[in-house]
Structure formats: C-alpha cells, structure tokens
Amino acid sequence: ECPMCGFEFGKDDDSQLEEFSMTEVDLLDRSPFRWMDIFGTGKCVTATGFNGFSMVIDVGELSCGLVKRSGGRIRMISIGTRKQAIASADDFLREIEDSNSAKKGRRWLNERISDKQREMLSRNGVQVSGFDFSWTKYKAACYLNYLWNKGRVDDMVNNVREKHEKR
C-alpha cells in the first residue's frame, strides 16, 4: 500500500507477463573511448587516454580487465564475462580522463602515426611501413602501451589461465 495515497499495488493484478525481451547494449559502441582490436583476433581490445589505458583480454571463457594509470602499475580489476571486463575497464578510463582530453584527443584518433612512434614500435619489433595508412597516433599509442607492459600483462593473463585450467 502506498503511504501517500493508499493505493494497493498488485491487489487486483492477476495478469501474467506473456512476453519479455532484453536488448543487448554494446558497451564498446557507447564508450566515449575508441576501443581497438590490436591483434585483429577479437581477443584483446584496448583503449587509451592521456592519463592511462585499459585492456580487455579473453582467456578461454573468461575475460580480464587490466588498467594502468600513467606513471602507475598495471593491475587487473575484473575477471568474468566480457561485458563485465569491458564495463570495469571503460569505467576506469571514464574516472581518470576528463571531458577536455576527449575533445583534444579526437584529432589524435585519426592523425597519421608520428615518426617517433614508428621508431618506438620498430625498437620493439613492430615494423610499420611508411605506406601503411592504417596506423594512426592513437593505434600506435594503444600498441605501445601493450608492448611496454607486455611482460606484466602476459604474467597476469597466464596466471588467470593456469587457475582457470585447474578447475
């Protein structure tokens, strides 16, 4: 009963719900960040900002959300479904980035890779041809974030894989 008006909820309502449908929300499309599939397999997506980056890596049936604040340590914030990992990784970026950086970053998303980024990628074993126009500053930044943290990322993912296989 409503304390304000006295209406009795559900008293005369014997009807059954006949049809119900849920719609899936594509978290990546709704994100203010551009999530990139850096290996082209769909198993590792990453997004970066000026203050940090996030990654979601599929490990068997699980997905892991990894994040790192600029100058900080990479850490795992989620192990679960892909949606859970993406939501937590995206929330992390939303918390550490401000709306001004999103505006500044739009231009950066589509600008050609810089010579400095091409050089850094090359030092890490990734050759980018001067004629490969698919490489932008943003794509290079995402890839470099992975390469610079590869050892720790691989350790964390392998740890999850080992624990999951023991089950």
What are these regions (language model features)?
Residues 1-167:
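Non-catalytic terminal extensions of ATP-dependent helicases
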